[in-house]
């Protein structure tokens, strides 16, 4: 016996495919969506379609954007001598929340993890190197404080230092094994201030 009408069962199934959404949460969300008026449902579904179709990656820094290059890369207000390397677009948001960082970004979309079979060629390092020839004086490595983040930071330092660019790593006021995106603004701000040369 089916507990739900087929369309609702399909909705619950699709919602439960999202990260962090289990069957019970998916069911709650489905019931919530069914209570919305039709225009709100259309608005919700259209916003998902728009986000998927209109969001792309910046060809310069790999961050999410609507236009290419992104607002960070094209802004004359940003410090173009400074690049902060992060693992994901969520980390860019975390850094921006501090209100302290005014440079550019480079998003790797991952970290080196030999255990998971992820090497340097599997993350977005290749387009970072040409950017360093454009007057960049410092690269701040802000990868997560875990084994993969450390491996990525060490690899980047070995790659960048011979080019004569200063390489620093954010200080570890962040919990070891934690994710940058979950750090509060004050902790992240202090970690940025206390960065050390690699």
Curated annotation (Swiss-Prot):
Recite the UniProt keywords alphabetically.
DNA damage, DNA recombination, DNA repair, Metal-binding, Zinc, Zinc-finger
Instruction: Enumerate the Gene Ontology biological process terms.
Output: DNA recombination; DNA repair
Gene Ontology molecular functions: DNA binding; zinc ion binding
Query: Mind telling me which SUPFAM superfamilies this protein's record contains?
Result: Recombination protein RecR
The organism's place on the tree of life at top rank = Bacteria
InterPro entries tied to this protein: DNA_Rcmb_RecR, Hlx-hairpin-Hlx_DNA-bd_motif, Rcmb_RecR, Rcmb_RecR_Znf, TOPRIM_dom, TOPRIM_RecR
KW Zinc-finger (keyword) present:
yes
Instruction: Note the Pfam families from the entry.
Output: RecR_C, RecR_HhH, RecR_ZnF, Toprim_4
Kindly list the ranges of residues that form C4-type zinc fingers according to the record: 58-73
> Taking every annotated instance into account, which residue ranges of this chain make up the domain Toprim?
81-175
**What HAMAP family does the record tag this protein with?**
RecR (MF_00017)
Task: Briefly state the protein's biological role.
Answer: May play a role in DNA repair. It seems to be involved in an RecBC-independent recombinational process of DNA repair. It may act with RecF and RecO.
Quote the PANTHER family the UniProt record gives.
RECOMBINATION PROTEIN RECR
As for family, the record states: Belongs to the RecR family.
Q: What is this protein called?
A: Recombination protein RecR
- Name its species: Halothermothrix orenii (strain H 168 / OCM 544 / DSM 9562)
């Amino acid at each position: 016996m089916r507990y739900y009408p087929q369309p609702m069962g399909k909705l619950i199934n699709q919602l439960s495919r999202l990260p962090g959404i289990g069957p019970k949460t998916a069911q709650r969300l489905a019931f919530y969506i069914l209570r919305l008026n039709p225009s709100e449902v259309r608005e919700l579904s259209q916003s998902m379609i728009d986000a998927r179709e209109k969001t792309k990656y910046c060809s310069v820094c790999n961050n999410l954007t609507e236009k290419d290059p992104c607002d960070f890369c094209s802004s004359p207000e940003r410090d173009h001598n400074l690049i902060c390397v992060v693992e994901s677009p969520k980390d860019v948001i975390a850094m921006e929340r501090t209100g302290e960082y005014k440079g550019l970004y480079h998003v790797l979309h991952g970290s080196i993890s030999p255990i998971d079979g992820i090497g340097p060629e599997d993350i977005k390092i290749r387009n970072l190197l040409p950017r360093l020839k454009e007057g960049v004086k410092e690269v701040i490595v802000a990868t997560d404080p875990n084994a993969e983040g450390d491996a990525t930071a060490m690899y980047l330092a070995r790659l960048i230092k011979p080019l004569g660019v200063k390489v620093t790593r954010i200080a570890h006021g962040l919990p070891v094994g934690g994710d940058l995106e979950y750090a509060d603004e004050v902790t992240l701000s202090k970690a940025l201030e206390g960065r050390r040369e690699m």
